[in-house]
Amino acid sequence: MLGHRPSGHANVSGTVRRFAVVASGVTPTNRRLLEAARGLGVSASLVQPANAAAWLRPGDVALGRLDVLPSLDGVEPGLYALRRLERAGIRVLNGPAALLAAHDKLTTAVQLGLAGLPHPRTVHVAEGRRPHLALPVVVKPRFGSWGRDVVACRSRLGLSHCLRRFRSRAWFRRQGALVQELIPARGRDLRIIVAGGEVVGAVERVAAAGEWRTNVALGGRRRAVDPPLDARLLAVAAAHSIGADLAGVDLLPDGSGGFVVLEVNGAVDFTDEYSLGGVPVFQRAVEALLAGGYAQADEEEAQAAGAHPSWARA
C-alpha cells in the first residue's frame, strides 16, 4: 500500500562520504536529519554556508536548509554558497534554484503553472496598482512564513484598506505583494513531506476556532494522516516542479474530492508525528535523499495500479 512501503533503500553508507546540512542554525529538524544519517552509518555534520566550500569535497552530499526570511537580502549569501558547492562537483540537494523558487511565492506560482498543477490564481501587485481578480482573495507577502501578514479580503473596500495598510510596510514597498484567489475555507489542509521524489510523511492541519488559517503558529492543530493517492501524486509533482529534493507541500481540499497546491516549502520543519507506516519520518527522508534522484516511487506504483490523478485529467 502506498505510504506503508517498508524502508528498503540500498545501503547508502558505502556510497556517501559525508552528509552535511548546510544551514545557519541547529534547529530540531536539522538535528534530527543529522541523527538519522548517522543512524544509517553516514558521517553527518551541520555546516555554516560560509564554511561549506572549504569543508566539503566531491563524494559528499550537501542538503541546503536556508532560513525563511522576509526578503532575499539574508538568503543570497547562502544561495551563493550552495552554487559554489555545485561548481566544485559536490552533490547539492535543495540547490540554489530550488530554494529560490520555494522562498519566493511568486516564482512558486509560476513554476506550478508551467507544470500544469492546480494552484490558486495569483497576481503580483505593487504600490499604485490594483489587482484584477474576482473576490474573495488573499493578500500575502512574496516572502516569509508562519501566516504573517496574510489577510483575507472579501470586499473591494476591504482589499483597498489592506493594500493601504501594507504601503507602510518596508517589504511591500520593496517587492509588492501577492493577491491570490481564496479557496473556500474548510478549516483543514494537508502538509506532505516529499524527499527524493517520495512521500515520506504527512499531517493534517486543523485551524483554531474562528481562524481560517491552519498554521500551528496561529493556534492550529495537527495530526498524523495517511494522505490519499491524489494528494501524494500532487505533492510529488509540486516538489518536482521547483526542483526541490526535500520540501513540505501544503495542499487544500478543493471541495470536489481533489486538492490544490497552496505552497511548496523548501525550509520545512517537521516532527516525528509526520511518520507514515511505522517508519520514522527522518530515517525515511534521509534514505530517500541519499538514494539519489527523483525515484517517484509513489507515481510508479500508482501507474502500475492504473491510477490517474484528477488534476492530470483536467
Show the residue positions of the predicted features.
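Active-site nucleotide/adenylate-binding loops and adjacent lid/helix of ATP-dependent enzymes
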Residues: 2-4, 13-16, 97-178, 182, ...
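Conserved N-proximal alpha/beta basic substrate-recognition cap immediately N-terminal to
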Residues: 24-121
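Protein kinase-like catalytic core scaffold
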Residues: 137, 178, 200-201, 247, ...
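Glycine-rich phosphate/pyrophosphate-binding beta-alpha loops
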Residues: 147, 265-278
